[in-house]
Design a protein with these regions (language model features):
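Acidic/polar loop-and-plug regions of large Gram-negative outer-membrane beta-barrel proteins
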Residues: 296-300, 313-380, 393-427, 470-499, ...
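Conserved C-terminal beta-signal and adjacent last beta-strands/turns
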Residues: 449, 568, 689-796
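Gram-negative outer-membrane beta-barrel transporters
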Residues: 621-623, 642-728
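Acidic, small-polar-rich N-terminal luminal/periplasmic segments of exported/outer-membrane proteins
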Residues: 53, 58, 72, 116-253, ...
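Membrane-embedded beta-barrel scaffold of Gram-negative outer-membrane proteins
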Residues: 376-392, 396-404, 566-567, 595-659, ...
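Outer-membrane beta-barrel translocator/receptor signature
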Residues: 219-221, 232-314, 318-324, 371, ...
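Structural signature of Gram-negative outer-membrane beta-barrels, strongest in the C-terminal barrel
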Residues: 313, 317-319, 427, 446-458, ...
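Surface-exposed extracellular loop regions of Gram-negative outer-membrane beta-barrel proteins
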Residues: 333-351, 457-462, 530, 557-602, ...
């Protein structure tokens, strides 16, 4: 389907229709919002703290709570339903004072409430930067404090404040993250602890894999990161970690928001957009809907190019007491500039041209569409047991044209270029999972159990590959564009690029609570896989392999108290060696070539102060073995492939996010990452490409609170630092370090009793020229220039 902005009015019309039709019914519905809980059975005090973190309605009380064990709480409930279940037979009852205030009251022996002074005031700020106590990326394993791996969360309020343009933007305050080859600015490529590429399968949507090039959009609630090998839960992966983009879900409480946006890079490079978000109950039933519509149309910040993107995301949910079902669909159409950036000269420095000057042609872009279908079913089998089923199908298609730099003549100030393209590209992924989570007491010890089955079927296909030589050289000093036309010569030997992967897996984990302080965790995954890859007309298979693997995981946690814990863990990952491109000598990668294996040791500490700060300190050492290495045999003149390669990444990471006080919020991080090749005939000792040895960030927000009655003002600013990085695998040039600052301001007021929010964001405040990643010296990504954007949101 070709992108056309003419469909936007229709979509906006479709967006408004449900509000007109459903609002009268929704207003009659019970005014309650649904929250997702994953709390183990624990002392009532701890359970109420976790409840507050999940709902923003902290329970602060003056009476002495009975020393009882609250039941496990897993699933989706309103705050009232969840609190009722937690209180159980404690002898306490709840009473709501207002929308964010609850009161606990003792029930007398005669069943009457004791109305002695026990007022509960909400301590949890709706604008808090503190993340939830549990992350869905762990597939229902309980509080993050009990997990012997680093987990980072970019909370919903950070997303709202910083208005990230893509996943790279959203993760700037997570330690150990740098950008990799982002395919000309069209794909999310996140390097985690030194590992990752743009097809590594490490990005999830609601815990299920996706193939979309860009995964962050208006339907995003928050972003979660699990650091280190994650094959126990997510199968075939590099050992750096996985990322989970959590979607907004239907709510029973009626909410509508209409947003309009405007932006500028200066010099006439402007943009506009808008969005609509509506959710609520359908009549008096437990059904809830959500509809999100968004459109963006902006000029690219360099000398030509446009970015257009439209999103329609309807979803429907059944929110019963024991069973919750979510059915969601997401349709996206996009047009991106396909920009390979600038080039570096033989002196290891960028060419002496303005950062805005492109080295390609105006027809360099990518146009496509994607569709994502998702079904989730959660059923509470008993107080301590939850059954989960998930299914997703997602597909993306695109056509891309590009002019690529193939050489630089610095003496003449000219470039040689090729005219390339990809037509009829398609990626799809089908995934299904069933898991059971719960806890049981055996031998006097509590066991938190997780068992599951996964199935995945993924295909990446690139149809017609355009390859042809430019008609003439190009002056980068005095450029004249328009001398070339889009390529049309299909190279048969490069076309029909295909990569198929099918996997089936069984995983299990047991977390044993030895006492109130010690938790021992052990688990394993058994995975079978089939991978087939190749290219060409006629088709030539270059990978045809299958196999199976056991992947273990073990860890130990010592909880000093509810707020501080220490942990240690050992984890493994695996990833089959594969190649779409032909290998020298016609070698086919088969079952005789062992998969890459990652082994990681990690030590750390976690701080979690309800209503205040959440922090993680981690020390890690990851080794990836069986990396495919090409060895040229001078005697036979042939290249022999072996699993002799090895890389290592070790370092320290610190993350902190939350509230310093009622007025101050912050999110920040620091990482030291020493990543290098440890075994390779040519590259041994080299630093891994695009990985910074030092990186860090800090962003702070000051909330002025209520001004002029109900009005509210918040100001925030921050900066991120990324150190020097190797620009290629051979380490012949480096990308310089950089520091980039951002700022924002929000002002909230009332308009006829409706909330109105004005927000100003400034990206790259000081208009710093910087280089975010590189493929080689001819493809060096240039960071975006300063952008000023203003949005206005009306809630009704």
């Amino acid at each position: 389907m070709k992108f056309t902005p003419r469909c936007v009015p229709l979509w906006l019309g479709l967006a408004v229709f449900p509000v007109i039709a459903i609002a009268p019914l929704a207003r009659a519905a019970e005014q309650m919002q649904a929250y997702t809980f994953a709390q183990p059975s624990q002392p009532l005090t701890q359970a109420l703290n976790a409840f507050s973190r999940a709902t923003g309605q902290s329970v602060v009380y003056t009476l002495e709570l009975p020393g009882v064990q609250a039941p496990a709480l897993n699933g989706t409930f309103s705050a009232e339903q969840a609190l009722q279940q937690l209180l159980g037979t404690s002898g306490l009852a709840w009473r709501r004072v207002d929308a964010r205030t609850l009161t606990l009251e003792a029930v007398g022996t005669d069943g009457a409430l004791s109305l002695q002074a026990t007022t509960v005031t909400s301590q949890m700020d709706a604008y808090s930067y503190q993340p939830p106590a549990s992350a869905s990326i762990m597939r229902g394993q309980g509080p993050n404090q009990d997990i012997p791996q680093a987990i980072n969360v970019v909370p919903a309020q950070v997303i709202r404040d910083q208005a990230p343009r893509n996943l790279d933007d959203a993760l700037t305050h997570v330690s150990g993250i740098t950008q990799g080859n982002n395919f000309g600015g069209t794909s999310d490529t996140v390097m985690k602890r030194g590992f990752g590429d743009n097809r590594d399968g490490s990005i999830m949507r609601d815990g299920m894999p996706i193939v979309q090039g860009r995964s962050l959009n208006a339907n995003t609630e928050r972003v979660e990161v699990l650091k280190g090998p994650a094959s126990l839960l997510y199968g075939i992966q590099d050992p750096g970690g996985v990322i989970n983009v959590v979607s907004k879900r239907p709510q029973l409480q009626q909410y509508n928001a209409l947003t309009v946006r405007g932006s500028t890079y200066g010099s006439g490079k402007n943009g506009s957009g808008g969005g609509f978000d509506s959710t609520g109950a359908l009549g008096d039933s437990p059904f809830a809907y959500r509809l999100i519509v968004d459109h963006e149309d902006e000029d690219y910040w360099r000398n030509f190019g446009v970015h257009r993107e439209s999103l329609v995301a309807p979803s429907l949910a059944w929110l019963g007491e024991d069973t919750q079902v979510v059915l969601a669909y997401e349709h996206r159409e996009f047009r991106y500039p396909f920009d390979r950036g600038t080039a570096f000269g033989s002196n290891g420095h960028p060419l002496g041209i303005p950062a805005t000057r492109r080295l390609d042609e105006p027809f360099n872009d990518m146009q496509g569409r994607s569709d994502l279908y998702r079904l989730e079913v959660d059923h509470q089998l008993a107080d301590d047991w939850k059954l989960h089923f998930g299914y997703s199908f997602n597909r993306e298609t695109y056509d891309a044209s590009q002019v690529r730099v193939t050489g630089v003549n610095e003496a003449k100030g000219t470039l040689t270029r090729s005219i390339d393209g990809t037509h009829n590209a398609m990626s799809r992924d089908q995934f299904a999972t069933v898991s059971l989570a719960g806890n049981v007491e055996l031998g006097g010890l509590q066991h938190d159990l997780l068992l599951g089955i996964d199935h995945e079927d993924r295909k990446v296909f690139r149809g017609d590959l355009i390859r042809q030589t430019a008609q003439s050289s190009f002056s980068y000093v005095n450029p004249v564009y328009g001398q070339e036309v889009e390529g049309s010569s299909v190279r048969a030997s490069d076309s029909d690029q295909t990569d198929k992967l099918r996997t089936d897996a069984l995983f299990m984990q047991d977390a044993v609570h030895l006492d109130d302080h010690w938790i021992v965790v052990a688990g394993a995954r058994f995975q079978q896989f089939d991978q087939y890859a190749g290219r060409g007309r006629p088709f030539k298979a270059n990978t045809d392999t299958s196999g199976q693997a056991w992947v273990p995981h073990a860890g130990i946690v010592y909880k000093v108290d509810d707020q501080l814990s220490f942990y240690g863990s050992y984890s493994e990952s695996f990833k089959p060696n594969s190649s779409i491109a032909p290998l020298t000598g016609g070698v086919v990668l088969d079952a005789s070539v062992a998969p890459e294996e990652g082994k990681s040791w990690e030590l750390g500490a976690k701080l979690d102060m309800p209503g205040s700060l959440t922090g993680t300190l981690a020390l890690f050492d990851i080794t990836k073995r069986n990396v495919l290495v090409a060895n040229f045999d001078s005697g036979t003149g042939e290249t022999v492939y072996s699993n002799a390669g090895e890389v290592n990444s070790r370092g320290v990471e610190l993350d902190l996010t939350g509230q310093l006080s009622e007025r101050w919020s912050l999110i920040g991080s620091y990482a030291f990452t020493d990543a290098k090749v440890t075994k390779d005939p040519d590259l041994e000792g080299n630093r891994l490409q695009n990985v910074a040895r030092h990186s860090g960030s800090l962003s702070a927000v000051y909330d002025f609170g209520s001004l002029f009655g109900a009005d509210r003002l918040r100001l925030g600013a921050g900066a991120r630092y990324v150190g020097e990085r190797a620009g290629n695998a051979t380490n012949t040039f480096d990308l310089p370090s950089y520091t980039v600052a951002d700022a924002f301001a929000t002002y909230e007021t009332k308009l006829d009793e409706h909330n109105v929010r004005l927000q100003l964001n400034v990206k790259n405040l000081f208009d710093k020229v910087y280089y975010s990643s590189a493929v080689n010296q001819y493809f060096v990504a240039v960071g975006d220039a300063r952008q000023v954007s203003l949005s206005s949101t009306l809630e009704f």
